[in-house]
Structures are given as structure tokens and as C-alpha cells.
Amino acid sequence: MSIRKRMNVLFGTLLLTGSLFSQNVCVSTPETSLVLSAPVGGELKHVYYGDKLSEVDLQNINLTGTPDMPAYPVYGLNCPGESALAVKHADGNMTLQMEIVQVKTSKEGNAEITAIELKDKVYPFYVNVYYKAYQDADVIETWTEIRHQEKKPVILNQFASAFLPIRRGDVWLSHLYGSWANEGRLCQEALEPGMKVIKNKDGVRNSHTSHAEVMFSLDGKPQENAGCVIGAALCYSGNYKLRIDT
């Protein structure tokens, strides 16, 4: 069994390319760097996203004490926050503990793909996390592929296309909502503690109600001509749910 879900993530002024340094995966643009900790046999973690790092910075980033977070958190042994993936194995166990099997990079047209394969420590259950970095646009495409080789079906209780931690601060969310003949209404709101959910269960008619696109303003209320933003959009139609946990 396999499942593939996909999301486009637009990092304002962000064009992602991939390179490996030691146990870290560095996905860089001309102006920014995204660093993931990816030791084989260890947990995939998000280390840094911000201004582009030099080679010296990359060599010393593990010495800075920069806090890291799971890059694709699963429900299991330690899950204080929202999980990207939660399953129920055939024997009733609901625990996952994923470790990195391998990291691969490849090129596809004008894009570079970083593929990180994860496997549960006990069960033959696998997750591949992909980052596809386009070279001619400030966009990366990220998605997950889920598969297993267990003898009986595995129930997927929750499975996300992607997960992105954002540092807390004066962060605002912009998104579109509406109804028939009143589509595309803009909502801008400060992120408060708790869970924000944007969802649509209207099949392919997503433009009528809540849209599957969001933008995070990282430095306060959105402005027309200035600011640091991260945008994300699902690249398929249909029912969806975007969860923002603060």
C-alpha cells in the first residue's frame, strides 16, 4: 500500500536547491538556507531556516545550540505537539518511531530533488519525505509517500502532505474564505495560542469557501510592499485540512 500527498511551499524570495554537509541536509536559495539534521539511523529534524548560511556557518551550526524540531513528527513515544502522521498497526499498536534509512538527491528538468527515506524501528513501515527545488522560480514542492510491508492493513488516522515549524513571535496568518457569489474574502489574523484549522469538504469546488492557500507574515501585521512571509498552497483540489498548531 502506498499513499502520496503533495504541497507547494512558496518561501517569499525563496528558491531552494539541495546539498549535503556531514549529517545535515542544506537546502539553499540565493538569499536563504533551510537546514535539516538527517543522520542515518537518527531522527529527521528541522534545524534552521533564515538568511543564507556560509560554508563556515554550516560547519558550526550544530555548535550554536539552535533548537531543532521534528521535520515530520509522528504519533508515538514523544509527541507533545501536533503529529503529521498517526497510524494504527494491524496488532493494535499506535506507536511510530521513524529513523532515517538514506538520503538521495537527483535532478529533474530545472529542479533538484532531495529524498529522505524513513523507516519505523520495529515495523516495516516507511515514509519518504521529498523536497523538489525549482531553479527558475522561488518555489519548492514538498510531499510524502507512505508505504508498508506489514502482513495486514494499517489504518492511517492522520497523514499530512508536509510539516513546517515556524518560530514563535508576532506571526500573522492570511487566507481566503467565502461562499457562493461571495468568494475570495481575505482574512488576516494574528496567530494566538491553540489550534487554527482551515478546511474544505466540498470536493472540487474549493474556490467557493475556504481556499487551500495560506501566507504567514513573520514580522507583524501584513504590509503591502514590505515584510518577511512564508506562503503555502496545496497543488491538488479536493477535500483537505490545514492545521496550524501554536
Please give the residue ranges for each predicted region:
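Polysaccharide-binding surfaces and accessory modules of carbohydrate-active proteins
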Residues: 24-35, 43-245
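Bacterial N-terminal signal peptides
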Residues: 9-19
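Bacterial N-terminal signal peptides that target proteins for export
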Residues: 1-11
